[in-house]
Amino acid sequence: MEARAQSGNGSQPLLQTPRDGGRQRGEPDPRDALTQQVHVLSLDQIRAIRNTNEYTEGPTVVPRPGLKPAPRPSTQHKHERLHGLPEHRQPPRLQHSQVHSSARAPLSRSISTVSSGSRSSTRTSTSSSSSEQRLLGSSFSSGPVADGIIRVQPKSELKPGELKPLSKEDLGLHAYRCEDCGKCKCKECTYPRPLPSDWICDKQCLCSAQNVIDYGTCVCCVKGLFYHCSNDDGDNCADNPCSCSQSHCCTRWSAMGVMSLFLPCLWCYLPAKGCLKLCQGCYDRVNRPGCRCKNSNTVCCKVPTVPPRNFEKPT
């Protein structure tokens, strides 16, 4: 029992030796003081080092040449506040001068590096913004750039083909005239003008007058029936069911008479067809520029050549 008590009593100095480390029991550890001072700093004190955002993209004012920029406040007051605050919050047991000097040295170094970094970043940002404003000011102040603004849509130049004079073939195209009416007898001028078929929906929908009559008088049903009942591939009865010159004329008219009992609108087909012929003749008479005479003599008219004018001053 005594041996165990002695071994237990002898183990206490062995456990206490690494904790003492050759110092007295009343002397504090400087590392504990440093960690305590670092934990004392709050977020408000750390943010006070840089209280403005220097990397904004907002509009900046061009500095005037007569005015000097206001000096930035020094960070001495911040250092004093940062240094003075931990001293008030120190526990009473840390009152030795060596502990204070060893704890303040790394903290002051970190603050000085942060403040110097903020100064250098401020200088670079202000210098870059001032250089940009100088470039912008010189570009906007230039007079020829403002005067060279295009305000009118430029017109395309005339094509070389438009500037060429009419050739002899173009001049002699309408040289053949009618002896009676005096109008041109070329193929282009004497071709009959049909009624327009794309006059609906801004010339996008195809709707001719013949199709309107076919669908309005139900003749489209008769054409479909004749198309399916015809055995001959060359038979055109379906295209013109009321024709008297084609084959099976009696059969077609008899079938149309029977269908008119169920479709009374078929009785309006022949009057509508006559109105269409009348409208076609009136439209052709108004819009055809050439000759409409059947038997007339053709006269060749020479196109007079105009000599060039001499732009000379009168004497």
Curated annotation (Swiss-Prot):
Keyword Kinase: no
Compositional bias of kind Polar residues: 1-15
Record field: compositional bias (Low complexity): 108-140
Listed Pfam families: Sprouty
Chain segments carrying region Required for interaction with TESK1: 178-315
Compositional bias ranges of the Basic and acidic residues kind: 20-32
Leader sequence residues: none
Region (Required for interaction with CAV1): 118-315
A GO BP annotation: negative regulation of ERK1 and ERK2 cascade
Post-translational modification (record): Cleaved at Pro-144 by the prolyl endopeptidase FAP (seprase) activity (in vitro).
Keywords linked to the UniProt accession: Cell membrane, Cell projection, Cytoplasm, Cytoskeleton, Developmental protein, Membrane, Microtubule
Cell compartment(s), UniProt: Cytoplasm, Cytoskeleton; Cell projection, Ruffle membrane
GO CC list: cytosol; microtubule; ruffle membrane
Taxonomy, superkingdom: Eukaryota
Site (Cleavage): 144-145
Location, primary (coarse class): cytoplasm
Coiled coil feature spans: none
Its biological purpose: Antagonist of fibroblast growth factor (FGF) pathways via inhibition of FGF-mediated phosphorylation of ERK1/2. Thereby acts as an antagonist of FGF-induced retinal lens fiber differentiation, may inhibit limb bud outgrowth and may negatively modulate respiratory organogenesis. Inhibits TGFB-induced epithelial-to-mesenchymal transition in retinal lens epithelial cells. Inhibits CBL/C-CBL-mediated EGFR ubiquitination.
PANTHER family listed in its UniProt record: PROTEIN SPROUTY HOMOLOG 2, SPROUTY
Subunit structure of this chain's protein: Forms heterodimers with SPRY1. Forms a tripartite complex containing GAB1, METTL13 and SPRY2. Within the complex interacts with METTL13. Interacts with RAF1. Interacts (via C-terminus) with TESK1 (via C-terminus); the interaction disrupts SPRY2 interaction with GRB2, potentially via disruption of SPRY2 serine dephosphorylation. Interacts with PPP2R1A/PP2A-A and PPP2CA/PP2A-C; the interaction with PPP2CA/PP2A-C is inhibited by interaction with TESK1, possibly by vesicular sequestration of SPRY2.
Similarity field: Belongs to the sprouty family.
Record note on domains: The Cys-rich domain is responsible for the localization of the protein to the membrane ruffles.
The protein's name: Protein sprouty homolog 2
Organism: Macaca fascicularis (Crab-eating macaque)
Source taxonomy: Eukaryota, Metazoa, Chordata, Craniata, Vertebrata
